[in-house]
Curated annotation (Swiss-Prot):
Disulfide partners: none
Protein's job: Alpha-D-galactose-specific lectin. Has hemagglutinating activity towards human and rabbit erythrocytes. Is highly cytotoxic to human cells in vitro.
Organism name: Morus indica
Protein family (similarity comment): Belongs to the jacalin lectin family.
Protein name: Galactose-specific lectin
Residues carrying covalently attached carbohydrate according to the record: 45
């Protein structure tokens, strides 16, 4: 499916993860859906990305996945509402780096076929980028402790 939101039940692969390899946070894997409608997350301009919660599409119906919450407060919330199904993510990028000795995801940017959301957070450290020529992001995975320890994605091909 070439950037086709109606990808149905095609095969999916996991890409990533970016960030920590070992974490004391709570790992999550939302699984695969038919698309992404909304991304809610938190960031702090001094530290890193905090909680994350994604609303997916399941065959035309919104499905709000569980919030993967930070252990701490002091973040700024962001809501990215995509114009589903005509708007979809074509690139995710960000920075990983150390905060208080922990390797975490410090910044995220989501680029769609219509606009760029971000960067949110601290744009220093090691840059990562996932450009998507073919396929579609249909799920998020990662780990959240004090901050977002790492992030990865399910890609429908």
């Amino acid at each position: 499916a070439k950037n086709n939101q109606q990808s149905g039940k095609s095969q999916s692969i996991v890409v990533g993860t970016w960030g920590a390899e070992v974490t004391s946070g709570v790992a999550f894997d939302d699984g695969s859906y038919t698309g992404i409608r909304e991304i809610n997350f938190e960031y702090n301009n001094e530290t890193a990305i905090g909680s994350i919660q994604v609303t997916y599409d399941v065959d035309g119906t919104p499905f709000e996945a569980k919030k993967h919450a930070s252990f701490i407060t002091g973040f700024t919330p962001v809501k990215i509402s995509l114009d589903f199904p005509s708007e979809y993510i074509v690139e995710v990028s960000g920075y990983t780096g150390k905060v208080s000795g922990y390797l975490v995801v410090r910044s995220l940017t989501f680029k769609t076929n219509k606009e760029t959301y971000g960067p949110y957070g601290v744009t220093s450290g090691t840059h990562f980028k996932l450009p998507i020529q073919d396929g579609l992001i249909v799920g998020f995975k990662g780990s959240v402790g004090y901050w977002l320890d790492y992030i990865g994605f399910h890609l429908a091909l």
